[in-house]
Amino acid sequence: MSEKLQDLAAHVAQQRPGDVISAEVVQGELTVTVKPEGIADFVRFLRDDAGCRFTTLVDLTAVDWPERVERFEMVWHFLSMWKNQRIRVKAGLAEDAMCPSIVEVYPAANWYEREVFDMFGILFSGHPDLRRLLTDYGFRGHPLRKDFPTTGYIELRYDEVQKRVVYEPVKLAQEYRQFDFLSPWEGAQSVLPGDEKRS
């Protein structure tokens, strides 16, 4: 399988040299890093090229890296049922940059892009209906950003006296705790149970 993925990585890099920044196989998964401005054409290539045929969009999400210049990392996962292969596509995105929508190529991206907009605040140019999906329309902020307070800004609850839902500022008995961006898992070796027996 690794040889097939290496061949696929070479094929993608050769066919789309203007889009591909890097292509590598790590732990049996192919990850291709691309320039965000060409993502729509790149995923169209992945779908239509006879050597790829990635016809299924499995997932679309983002990762927040507050310390990086390109704060957000967009991540798309595709599946080729014809080739029995998966590919991960990544693109760095500055905080104030817009990401081109891929809804025209993969209609399934519609709600994924709405979710990423709602949770991270990333705007998608060319999206037909970019509005909040999971939070209330009056919600302030984007909950999956690492600078979003873990307590939120407002509390939503049902008031028995008023017989309706009310919004109130969050009041806590303890002080706000600052989130530590360093992860204890960074640099960890991914060893699965049973791997130690192979050596």
UniProtKB/Swiss-Prot annotation:
Membrane topology: Peripheral membrane protein
Cellular component annotations (GO), alphabetically ordered: plasma membrane
Keywords on record: Cell inner membrane, Cell membrane, Membrane, NAD, Quinone, Translocase, Transport, Ubiquinone
Highest taxon above the source species: Bacteria
InterPro entries: NADH_DH_suC, NADH_quin_OxRdtase_su_C/D-like, NADH_UbQ_OxRdtase_30kDa_su, NADH_UbQ_OxRdtase_CS
Location of the protein in the cell: Cell inner membrane
One Gene Ontology MF term: NADH:ubiquinone reductase (non-electrogenic) activity
E.C. numbers: 7.1.1.-
Short name of one Pfam family: Complex1_30kDa
Reaction catalyzed: a quinone + NADH + 5 H(+)(in) = a quinol + NAD(+) + 4 H(+)(out)
NCBIfam families, per the entry: NuoC_fam (TIGR01961), PRK06074.1-5 (NF004733)
HAMAP family documented for this protein: NDH1_NuoC
Function summary: NDH-1 shuttles electrons from NADH, via FMN and iron-sulfur (Fe-S) centers, to quinones in the respiratory chain. The immediate electron acceptor for the enzyme in this species is believed to be ubiquinone. Couples the redox reaction to proton translocation (for every two electrons transferred, four hydrogen ions are translocated across the cytoplasmic membrane), and thus conserves the redox energy in a proton gradient.
Family: Belongs to the complex I 30 kDa subunit family.
Subunit structure of this chain's protein: NDH-1 is composed of 14 different subunits. Subunits NuoB, C, D, E, F, and G constitute the peripheral sector of the complex.
Record-given protein name: NADH-quinone oxidoreductase subunit C
The encoding gene: nuoC
